Amino acid sequence: MSSGGLLLLLGLLTLWEVLTPVSSKDRPEFCELPADPGPCNALSQAYYYNPVQHKCLKFRYGGCKANPNTFKTIEECKRTCAA
């Protein structure tokens, strides 16, 4: 294979790595936990990663003592669990 072909292959592999979503083996284990509103009653909007649907979803968060699969923004959820 020519050096140009190798360079093209390397570029395509790099692009593939960047565009490929986080696989379940690279995702933190806490992303598999269910939505947890916690014991408090503030009821604010939060996000959690749903491993069955492979996306971040809204849920009502009580405001305290939730599990680590609880995010203030959908962007934070995606960056951590679904990116």
Swiss-Prot record:
SMART domains: KU (SM00131). Keywords: Disulfide bond, Protease inhibitor, Secreted, Serine protease inhibitor, Signal. Residues 31-81 form the BPTI/Kunitz inhibitor domain. Serine protease inhibitor. It comes from Hoplocephalus stephensii (Stephens's banded snake). InterPro entries: Kunitz_BPTI, Kunitz_BPTI_sf, Prtase_inh_Kunz-CS, TFPI/VKTCI-like. GO terms for molecular function: serine-type endopeptidase inhibitor activity. This is Kunitz-type serine protease inhibitor stephenin-1. Belongs to the venom Kunitz-type family. It holds the Pfam family Kunitz_BPTI.
